[in-house]
Amino acid sequence: MRKLIKLNVIVFVLLYLGELFASLSFKLISCLKTRNQYSLNGYYALFVFVNIIQKMANSFQKLASSVVLFETEINEFLVLFTDTKNKREESEPVRQVSTTQEYHQVTLDQQHYFNHKLSDYFRLFKDKTFFFEII
């Protein structure tokens, strides 16, 4: 049985931290708008602080996307390695594709396999409310 590397917990944590820092920066901006008691230096310091927090949130999101890319590359390598290893061990004859319809079906099956493997991550990046479903 194939065991593929799963790094989804790390991705969830990184994206959750990114969302947490982004919401913290928005709360600071709203507090800044409600209280007009700060001097110009105070506004500048809070602006710099909010800018740093937003950069941290963006870096967490970029790191999460790089973890997903790393996982896909490793999983594709493992799939190729285990497929060739299984073919050598079983010594089955290679299936010859006789018609173009069978060829297209084989390529569609391979594409479906790789697309199905990443469907959860695509949902994760497209749907920001996915974290709140977990929590």
Swiss-Prot record:
For this protein, the record's InterPro entries field holds:
DUF5426
Superkingdom of origin organism: Bacteria
**Organism for this UniProt entry:** Mycoplasma pneumoniae (strain ATCC 29342 / M129 / Subtype 1)
Kindly list the organism's lineage. Bacteria, Bacillati, Mycoplasmatota, Mycoplasmoidales, Mycoplasmoidaceae
UniProt protein name: Uncharacterized protein MG074 homolog
